[in-house]
Amino acid sequence: MAHPKAKVSKSRRDKRRAQFNARTKAATTVNCPNCGEPTLPHRACRHCGHYRGRAVVAKAANS
């Protein structure tokens, strides 16, 4: 039966497992209620600069 040659630390083990999760899970997106563009949840919209009904990032009028 196989056995480890050396102890694998929690940090090293978690780094290895994180690579698997990063490759298998797709990023979740939601539509911005202000402009309708897809954006990441809990972040300001990259297109219009709104978050939770407020303009938090100044955007140019023509973009």
UniProtKB/Swiss-Prot annotation:
One Pfam family here: Ribosomal_L32p
Highest taxon of source: Bacteria
GO biological-process terms attached to the record: translation
InterPro entries assigned to the protein according to its UniProt record, in alphabetical order: Ribosomal_bL32 (IPR002677), Ribosomal_bL32_bact (IPR044957), Ribosomal_zn-bd (IPR011332)
Keyword Glycosyltransferase tagged: no
Record's keyword terms, sorted: Ribonucleoprotein, Ribosomal protein
GO function term, MF aspect, one: structural constituent of ribosome
One of the record's GO cellular component terms: large ribosomal subunit
Annotated SUPFAM superfamilies: Zn-binding ribosomal proteins (SSF57829)
Bias-annotated ranges (Basic residues): 1-18
Segments for region (Disordered): 1-25
Keyword Ubl conjugation attributed: no
Family: Belongs to the bacterial ribosomal protein bL32 family.
PANTHER family (UniProt xref): 50S RIBOSOMAL PROTEIN L32, LARGE RIBOSOMAL SUBUNIT PROTEIN BL32
Protein name from the UniProt record: Large ribosomal subunit protein bL32
The species this protein was found in: Chlorobium phaeovibrioides (strain DSM 265 / 1930) (Prosthecochloris vibrioformis (strain DSM 265))
